[in-house]
């Protein structure tokens, strides 16, 4: 595992167990480095075999950066540049009316985390106050979006 934007590995376990991730997979918010879902042979994008098929990332929280990145990822799925993308965001993120367009096809669903991720080593002593979810856009998904829940362990 090279890195991930949270020290809480349960976030990665949850999406890996709850969704099939097309390979290779990268994290665009961290210099295109492979995610710890299934990292590249030597841990660098240039070492990956073939173009990325999916993007899994924790986008920056600040506007307009977050929406710019997410809309580009969704467009990449819609245009079949990648098969799927997923973003790790707070549970209320998808309630903003300005983001309504994001939740048309190929929006596939969410994975609600049944734990609150820790972001820093010092935070393990205190319980974080925000709940998080993975939002998934996937061209392979058929039917209505699904809601899944995962505890980050099983």
Where are these regions (language model features)?
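Class I S-adenosyl-L-methionine-dependent methyltransferase catalytic core
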Residues: 1-154
């Amino acid at each position: 595992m090279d890195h991930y934007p949270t020290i809480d590995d349960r976030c990665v376990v949850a999406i890996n167990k709850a969704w099939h991730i097309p390979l290779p997979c990268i994290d665009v918010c961290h210099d295109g480095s492979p995610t710890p879902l299934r990292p590249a042979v030597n841990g660098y994008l240039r070492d990956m075999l073939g173009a990325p098929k999916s993007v899994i990332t924790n986008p920056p929280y600040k506007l307009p950066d977050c929406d710019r990145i997410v809309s580009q990822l969704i467009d990449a799925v819609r245009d079949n540049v990648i098969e799927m993308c997923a973003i790790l965001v707070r549970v209320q993120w998808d309630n903003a009316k300005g983001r309504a367009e994001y939740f048309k096809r190929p929006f596939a669903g969410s994975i609600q985390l049944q734990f609150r991720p820790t972001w820093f080593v010092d935070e393990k002593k205190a319980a974080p106050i925000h709940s998080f979810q993975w939002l998934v856009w996937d061209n392979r998904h058929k039917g209505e979006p699904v809601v899944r829940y995962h505890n980050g362990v099983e």
